[in-house]
């Protein structure tokens, strides 16, 4: 899911943090494997929304996409490493269960769309039912290892492992192009630099975006803990979003209350005040209903002859009651609308919202220390797996293996920024005082004093006259 609205906030309040670059040539990049596999699964489908299969009925689209996309990355002078998710944190189980519910709902709606809907409806609902399974991951890991591409299985979140590799200077982090995606979690895991829109598709030519965390923290936030607070408030994968909080209001709240702790306290107090006000309105409304149900106290006294005057009284009372009743109903409806407006609008924080646990995951994520190594592809293994088992074209597989051997084994041309480092400008030296010669080097105060004494002694000895005997 990512961090909602973070890209827009950085563009507005920390524009120096985002810049466009033309190429990642000569870089080593870490790629979130699950996200990539998911995109390949939903990319090409049949008219009925089902996945493309081979002659044996097996789904192979994700393997084909991973094989050829990785080839294009390598051909562009980039060395990729794929990071796979491990066991999800306990805090994420609630989000995963809700995703499962949404997939089941989409499956039912998709079946209805096949009967009454359009092709677009069927495709839309079928995309929502896609899930990356353990079998998908295992087959992709096998393919990548045969290609000579490093595979890292994270102990927990793949984004956290990517950030660890990036902090160690082993890789940069790159994301494939994904329309409308806000996959910025890696920054919250303290990744120094994130590259987005990594694509080599002719139909989706778009410059690569580089997001620099250090530049982002020099904007309106100034500290990494505050940045984490903002990301959690915007909405992350571990907590339900707070209704009524958008990017602008989130930044305003963080600034006003100094962090997420103060924001949560403020929202809790506000919710308690609204709840008390709502209870008071309901109590007043109940007392009004009780008064309406009580009989009029003078009705028995003013009717000595119940038979005759009851008929006349009914004729006279009907118009009065018909006029009075709507007023009371109108007043009660206004009260209900007022009560509904108080309880249903504004910012609403869930009763259970363990933001402290989410912050711990971002500050101290689970990761492993790994060295990455790119090796020669196993050509025979690729032919056995892709051609004999999955029905791929043998000529294309062998040509792809040749490209891998060529680009992975060739000595990679270095980047200029690998030879030079930017240094801050040194302050200009103060001009020497008039009448004193400029020395060629730096002489400390002690050396200067010693030299001055030697010069004075030489001058005095030269000016002395010899003594007469």
From Swiss-Prot:
The record's listing under Pfam families reads: XPG_I, XPG_N
- What are the Acidic residues biased-composition ranges? 282-295, 302-317
Family under the similarity heading: Belongs to the XPG/RAD2 endonuclease family. FEN1 subfamily.
Q: What is this protein called?
A: Flap endonuclease 1-B
Q: Which UniProt keywords apply?
A: DNA damage, DNA repair, DNA replication, Endonuclease, Exonuclease, Hydrolase, Magnesium, Metal-binding, Mitochondrion, Nuclease, Nucleus, Phosphoprotein
* A GO CC annotation given for this chain: nucleoplasm
Looking at the record, which segments are called Disordered? 274-354, 424-469
Q: Might you give the EC number(s) for this enzyme? A: 3.1.-.-
The subcellular localization recorded is: Nucleus, Nucleolus; Nucleus, Nucleoplasm; Mitochondrion
Superkingdom of source? Eukaryota
Q: What does this protein do?
A: Structure-specific nuclease with 5'-flap endonuclease and 5'-3' exonuclease activities involved in DNA replication and repair. During DNA replication, cleaves the 5'-overhanging flap structure that is generated by displacement synthesis when DNA polymerase encounters the 5'-end of a downstream Okazaki fragment. It enters the flap from the 5'-end and then tracks to cleave the flap base, leaving a nick for ligation. Also involved in the long patch base excision repair (LP-BER) pathway, by cleaving within the apurinic/apyrimidinic (AP) site-terminated flap.
Q: Where is the composition biased (Basic residues)?
A: 326-342
Positions with biased composition (Basic and acidic residues):
441-459
MF terms (GO), sorted A to Z: 5'-3' exonuclease activity; 5'-flap endonuclease activity; DNA binding; magnesium ion binding
Identify the main location.
nucleus
Give binding positions for DNA. Answer: 45, 69, 157, 235, 237
Which Gene Ontology terms describe the biological processes this protein takes part in?
base-excision repair; DNA replication, removal of RNA primer
Under the subunit heading, UniProt states:
Interacts with PCNA. Three molecules of FEN1 bind to one PCNA trimer with each molecule binding to one PCNA monomer. PCNA stimulates the nuclease activity without altering cleavage specificity.
Quote the record's cofactor note. Binds 2 magnesium ions per subunit. They probably participate in the reaction catalyzed by the enzyme. May bind an additional third magnesium ion after substrate binding.
Write out the ranges of the annotated region (I-domain): 121-257
**Residue sites binding Mg(2+) 2 per the record:** 183, 185, 237
Q: Which SUPFAM superfamilies match?
A: 5' to 3' exonuclease, C-terminal subdomain, PIN domain-like
State its cofactor.
Mg(2+)
Annotated region N-domain: the residues are 1-103
């Amino acid at each position: 899911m990512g961090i909602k609205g973070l890209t827009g906030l950085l563009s507005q309040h920390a524009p120096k943090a985002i810049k466009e670059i033309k190429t990642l040539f000569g870089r080593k990049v870490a790629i979130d494997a699950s996200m990539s596999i998911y995109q390949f699964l939903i990319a090409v489908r049949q008219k009925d929304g089902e996945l493309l299969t081979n002659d044996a009925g097996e789904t192979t689209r994700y393997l084909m996409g991973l094989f050829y996309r990785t080839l294009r990355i390598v051909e562009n002078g980039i060395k990729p490493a794929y990071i796979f998710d491990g066991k999800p944190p306990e805090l994420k189980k609630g989000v995963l269960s809700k995703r499962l519910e949404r997939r089941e709902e989409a499956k039912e709606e998709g079946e209805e769309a096949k009967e009454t809907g359009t092709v677009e409806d069927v495709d839309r609902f079928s995309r929502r039912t896609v899930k990356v399974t353990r079998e998908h991951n295992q087959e992709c890991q096998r393919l990548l290892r045969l290609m000579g591409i490093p595979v890292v299985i994270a102990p927990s979140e793949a984004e956290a492992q990517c950030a660890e590799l990036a902090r160690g200077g082993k890789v940069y982090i790159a994301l494939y192009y994904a329309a409308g995606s806000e996959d910025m979690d890696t920054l919250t895991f303290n990744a120094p630099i994130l590259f987005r829109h990594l694509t080599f598709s002719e139909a989706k030519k778009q410059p690569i975006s580089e997001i620099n965390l250090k530049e982002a923290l020099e904007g309106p936030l100034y500290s990494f803990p505050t940045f984490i607070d903002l990301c959690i408030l915007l909405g992350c994968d571990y907590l339900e979003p707070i209704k009524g909080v958008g990017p602008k209001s989130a930044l305003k709240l963080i600034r006003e209350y100094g962090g997420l702790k103060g924001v949560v306290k403020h929202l809790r107090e506000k919710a308690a005040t609204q709840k008390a006000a709502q209870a008071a309105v309901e109590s007043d409304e109940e007392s009004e209903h009780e008064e309406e149900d009580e009989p009029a106290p003078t009705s028995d006294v003013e009717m000595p002859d119940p038979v005759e005057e009851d008929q006349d009284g009914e004729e006279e009372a009907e118009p009065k009651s018909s006029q009075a009743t709507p007023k009371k109903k109108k007043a009660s409806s206004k009260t209900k609308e007022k009560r509904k407006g108080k309880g249903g609008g504004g910012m609403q924080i869930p009763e259970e919202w363990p933001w402290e646990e989410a912050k711990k995951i971002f500050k101290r994520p689970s990761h492993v220390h790994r060295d990455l190594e790119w090796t020669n592809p196993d050509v025979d293994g690729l032919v056995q797996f892709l051609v004999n088992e999955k029905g791929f074209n043998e000529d294309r597989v062998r040509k792809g293996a040749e490209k891998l051997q060529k680009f992975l084994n060739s000595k990679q041309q270095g980047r200029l920024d690998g030879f030079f480092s930017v240094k801050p400008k040194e302050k200009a030296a103060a001009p020497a005082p008039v009448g004193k010669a400029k020395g060629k080097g730096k002489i400390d105060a002690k050396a200067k004093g010693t030299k001055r004494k030697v010069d004075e002694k030489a001058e005095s000895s030269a000016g002395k006259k010899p003594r007469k005997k």
